[in-house]
Amino acid sequence: RIDHYLGKETVQNLMAVRFGNVLFEPLWNNHYVDHIQITVAETVGVEGRGSYYDQAGAMRDMVQNHLMQLLCLIAMEAPARFDADAVRDEKLKVIRALEPVEPHHIARGQYDGGGDLPSYREDVDNPRSFTESFVALKCRIANWRWAGVPFYLRTGKRMTTRSSEIAVVFQDLGHSIFEGDETRHRNILSIRLQPNEGIDLQVTIKEPGPGGMRLIDVPLDMTFADALDGNGEDVPDAYERLIMDVIRGNQTLF
């Protein structure tokens, strides 16, 4: 089965960021990571897919495929080599290590109508529907690397903004040497899948100007379009990339 999310350039860069940089891999564990958020928010509604969507819901439509694939790429161990079997084996280890999700760690909801926009029940033409168009859940992975680190997954339709992002939130220092600084500053690695594909690293710096050491958090921003200086314009989209892989017999992204 093909998951088109895996064809996105930024999703493929997850493995490059993790396993191609000495900076991140030593910190990629429960000693340094506080929690991880995976968000896929859409501004559209079910848009003519009501008969299908009302049977599936957000959990089956998004979580069990797209979000789980992202979770696996974030949490997996380094494969012995970069090929389909080795990558798939490491993903399966993550799936097998997932703890059962407790009912009180799941939130479900539907979008309501407003203005010219219909409600979910109007979109699916089912006034009694209880199928979720939004779902959020807290997952845990029972292995040495991730024990105690919560993974927060959420996805929904008719949200305020369209955004797909993974945020790796690192632990705070626990103690500040700077007098008067009571903010619990955290480094956050944000990987934007859409729109404006790119990577941000939030770091803490001194606020410019006199008056002592006032600290602020600022992003080190890398947007692919800017970093490639136009050289990424001809990069194939997710579906094109996966179709090419099918033709070439490359199953790494399947």
Model-derived regions, located:
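Secretory/organelle targeting and membrane-embedding segments
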Residues: 1-254
